[in-house]
Structures are given as structure tokens and as C-alpha cells.
Amino acid sequence: MMIDLNADLGEGGANDSALLQLVSSANIACGFHAGDAGLMVQSVREALKYGVAVGAHPGYPDRENFGRTAMDLPPETVYAQMLYQIGALAAIVQAQGGELQHVKPHGMLYNQAAKSPPLADAIARAIRDVNPKLVLVGLAGSELIRAGQHYGLTTRQEVFADRGYLADGSLVPRSQPGALIDSEEQALAQTLEMVQHHRVRSISGEWANVVAQTVCLHGDGPHALDFARRLRAAFAGRHILVSAQLDAEA
């Protein structure tokens, strides 16, 4: 069995360099919700140094709220913003001798696209128009995954180690109780359940089916690195190989 481990980087976090030695994919902020040109170059160089797959992490133009506030933008505006952000990072990766591998939207853009077909369509279409070989990373079972499949993109269905789930397989909004899992033991158990048995227990107690092809590790918590190491050890003990090159993707 294989699984991809990804982390959102280039957002000013202190753990970026250490996380790059534990994950297989890096999603690098493209300057809208966080990061800037210099940090993008630095992050790409470090990711390539450690042999980590580099992806774009485009978000809403909302630095004040870290891209976590809902916005009601026309799909064509979102399409243009995706071209701008993905294209910028792709150029930086190419200039550093690498190749952009995937795209994972950030924050509220990611969450809204999970449930909004027009928004998901704009994002998937932009990715296809930049490079149809790019992998689209989205919430497992979401509209974003369906849009990517519609446009012929390779998709990678994502689950979250430290986020609570609703009965429909969507994430508990950050504004609600149960959105974040503070217990490392609970997060570890949830991740293994999703990866090995393709299901997650929702905050209401029901099981929701999920397809786990990549696991997101949030690197901004006080115990983020310890948890990442524990998760890697748990995978190794169960003969689960961590790699960005999955055998079969959706």
C-alpha cells in the first residue's frame, strides 16, 4: 500500500524545512493568501533539495484572514486568479530546474470548491489550461474531484489527519466545535482508519466513506513535527510506503 503525505508550505511557518524531510509533497503558497516571490523561490529550492514533489497552493486574495474567509467571486475571476498563481509558481519551479507536479487550492477556496460545481469547474479548467498533466488535489469525494475528472485531470483525493468530519464526508467548518483534533492519539487513529479502511467516524458518530490517496499534515501546530514522525513510523510499521508517485490515482 502507498500513500502520499502533503503539507502546506511557504506560508511563513517555522517548521517548513523540517517538514520537508517528512512529507512526499509540498503545496507552496502563491502570494495571494500568504507568501511572496522570495519565499516561493526559497520554498521551491528546499523542496527540490529534499526530493519532494512541488505543488501550487493558490488561494483567495485575502492575506488579512489567511484565505479563510468566504468570498463570492465570479467563476471567471477565480479562473484568472488560478492562472496567475499557478503560472507564477510553475515558472519558479522551472527556473530552479524542477517541474510543477500538482495543484491544491487553499483554505476557503478549497472548502467552497468542494461543494460548488461552478467554482470547482473554474479551478479544474484553469489547471487543465495551464498544464493538463498537473494533478488536482481536492477533498475526497468532493465537487472539486468530480470537476477534475470531468476535464480529464489526474486527481488525488485528500484526507486530513487533524480535522473533524461531518456525516457527509465534508470537513467540520473551523468556526464550529469539533473542527480540529487536538489529541495526537485520536488524529493518528483517524488517519490509519482512513488510509487502511477508507472510512472516518464523523463528529455525530456515523461512519463516512472516504478515498484516501494523500494525507494533509498541518505544520503550524506546536506538536506538528512530533506527530508527523509518529505517523511516518506508524505507516512504516504497517508496510505503508509514503510516496508522491502513487500506483493508481482517480
UniProtKB/Swiss-Prot annotation:
Chemical reaction(s) catalysed: 5-oxo-L-proline + ATP + 2 H2O = L-glutamate + ADP + phosphate + H(+)
Q: Which residues form a coiled coil?
A: none
Q: Which of UniProt's keywords are assigned here? A: ATP-binding, Hydrolase, Nucleotide-binding
Its Enzyme Commission number(s) read 3.5.2.9
Q: What class of enzyme is it?
A: hydrolase
One Gene Ontology term of the molecular function aspect: ATP binding
InterPro entries, alphabetically? Glyco_hydro/deAcase_b/a-brl, LamB/YcsF/PxpA-like
Task: Give a GO biological-process term.
Answer: carbohydrate metabolic process
- Recorded family membership: Belongs to the LamB/PxpA family.
Give the function comment from the record: Catalyzes the cleavage of 5-oxoproline to form L-glutamate coupled to the hydrolysis of ATP to ADP and inorganic phosphate.
Give the matching HAMAP family. Answer: PxpA
User: What is annotated about its quaternary structure and interactions?
Assistant: Forms a complex composed of PxpA, PxpB and PxpC.
Q: What is this protein called?
A: 5-oxoprolinase subunit A
Name the source organism: Klebsiella pneumoniae (strain 342)
Q: What is the lineage of its organism?
A: Bacteria, Pseudomonadati, Pseudomonadota, Gammaproteobacteria, Enterobacterales
Question: What gene name is given for the protein in this entry?
Answer: pxpA
